[in-house]
Amino acid sequence: EVDIVVRKGKHVLVEGPNGIGKSTFIDAIANNTADGVTIGEGVRVGYYSQNFSTLDYNQTAYNCLLGVMDLKDEQVLRSTAASFLLDGKALSNEIGALSEGQKGLLQFARLVLMQPGLLILDEPTNHINFRHLPVIAEALDKFEGAMLLVSHVPDFVEQVRVDEKIDMKAV
């Protein structure tokens, strides 16, 4: 049993060996099916799933990004996409046609545009080119909302502020 309160600004690392249930645990939180877990009313949850299950593969990347924006602004959408190396060609493609790396970068752009209060990240370094990791780590480190992070990449985790850890072996 886990007893933890994750408030605005708190960054929590969920750790443990492969197969212990970290992804299942945070997926249940993200989908609001975890027993004993309550997400505050009105808190927008941004979920980065390592298997891209939150993406509609038949939708264009552009429409995926546009769909999460409260204020539809073409310039903001395109500049955010560009900051994650997604150009006009990538945006016009269906998500299913993107490379795994582009799908990962699309998820990050989507989270930026979504502006969540709670960010849940399941192995966000999977499929991402190692050259892009410092930029992503810096963005996560500066994230002002609450965050739950699962990562098996110590070099990446060291670059992100972690306020508390949940050891799944102890649960």
Residue ranges and their predicted role:
Residues 1-171:
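ABC ATP-binding cassette signature C-motif
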